[in-house]
Amino acid sequence: MTGSSIYAQPAYILQHKPYRESSLILEVFTQDFGLLTLLAKGVRKAKSRTAGVLLPFSLLHISYLDRHELKLLLDVELLEQHVLARLSLYCGFYVNELLQRFLQLQDPNPELFVRYQQVLQQLARVQDAEV
């Protein structure tokens, strides 16, 4: 396994898709590496301790193995949970979709990461009438 490196980063999950029986493919937005695609093996199993934290709008600290274009998630820790409801939830998903559409893979944008975090904090605070 030469050429592999382990990285640790703050990250937000923009989207997750089922992969095989027990895994997920994650699209994550990281502070220093931008948009990444990760494989989270075994997280859909009933005994998985990480399944409950792999949700959109949660600030996570992730560790991953960088082997190829598809990286392997090694560990995840929940740092901050943004709870979005009703219209705020739809706005959050729309922002996630925009990020996925316009960001290039592995193109760092730390300033946009901070702005995204601010948007989520604001959406979590406001009532639907204010959005």
What are these model-predicted stretches?
Residues M1-L24, F29-V131:
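Non-catalytic alpha-helical scaffolds and adjoining flexible linkers that form interface surfaces
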